[in-house]
Swiss-Prot record:
The keyword Mitochondrion does not apply. GO terms for molecular function: cysteine-type endopeptidase activity; DNA binding. Its main location: virion. GO terms for cellular component: host cell nucleus; virion component. All late proteins expressed from the major late promoter are produced by alternative splicing and alternative polyadenylation of the same gene giving rise to non-overlapping ORFs. A leader sequence is present in the N-terminus of all these mRNAs and is recognized by the viral shutoff protein to provide expression although conventional translation via ribosome scanning from the cap has been shut off in the host cell. Its EC number is 3.4.22.39. The active site is at residues 57, 74, 125. Interacts with protease cofactor pVI-C; this interaction is necessary for protease activation. The gene is L3. HAMAP family: ADV_PRO (MF_04059). This is Protease. Belongs to the peptidase C5 family. Transmembrane segments: none annotated.
Length: 206
């Protein structure tokens, strides 16, 4: 992200603090080559745009080889068609490029977040991705919910993303996100004021 949002360096530092590093392949733009090993648990943070644009929106992707599940986490919970429409981003090709698609039985489960936890004008997508990856490495069989990291967040149907009546719920999620990072990330604590300013709930309106 350029003026608002999170830089790649920032996300890598926070991910390291959260204990994700042993499984973390890195931050990538939309040209992410996919997961290179079908036998190893792995994850990444991927932007929907090319690096040359400065970035647009962060997603998290993760692979659990035990259950053969490919997780795609989008804090907005956009549908496949909406991701393509809004960002011209398609993950099907990415999935095909991954080594996991060439596993012997080619039986891969795609699990995708389909509800919204982030406000429409928030620039905290990268931070939410870090939070999700913490859940993934600790509870790889159910990282979206039913765990102490993501469980406290409240989701709303994606079609209500801009509904004024749910903004307090989404604002509350961002406050919980900041508190989580304050507790678990030394990098976040050291740069909290600047990070909060760049990822503010109303940042895209400023």
């Amino acid at each position: 992200m350029a003026e608002g949002g999170s830089s790649e360096e920032e996300l890598r530092a926070i991910v390291h603090n959260l204990g994700v590093s042993p499984f973390f392949l890195g931050t990538f733009d939309k040209r992410f080559p996919g997961f290179i090993s079908s036998q190893r648990m792995a994850c990444a943070i991927v932007n929907t745009a090319g690096r040359e644009t400065g970035g647009v929106h962060w997603l998290a992707m993760a692979w659990n080889p035990r259950s053969k599940t490919f997780y795609m986490f989008d804090p907005f919970g956009f549908s496949d068609s909406k991701l393509k429409q809004v960002y011209s981003f398609e993950y099907e090709g990415l999935l095909r490029r991954s080594a996991i698609a060439s596993s012997p039985d080619r039986c891969v489960t795609l699990a995708k977040s389909n509800e919204t936890i982030q406000g429409p004008n928030s620039a905290a997508c990268g931070l939410f991705c870090c939070m999700f990856l913490h859940a993934f490495v600790n509870w790889p069989d159910d990282p979206f919910d039913h765990n102490p990291t993501m469980g406290p967040l409240k989701s709303v149907p994606n079609y209500k993303l801009n509904d004024p009546t749910v903004q307090y719920v989404l604002w509350g999620n961002q406050e919980k996100l900041y508190k989580f990072l304050e507790k678990h990330s030394a990098y976040f604590r050291a740069h909290a004021a600047a990070i909060k300013a760049r990822t503010a709930f109303n940042k895209l309106k400023q």
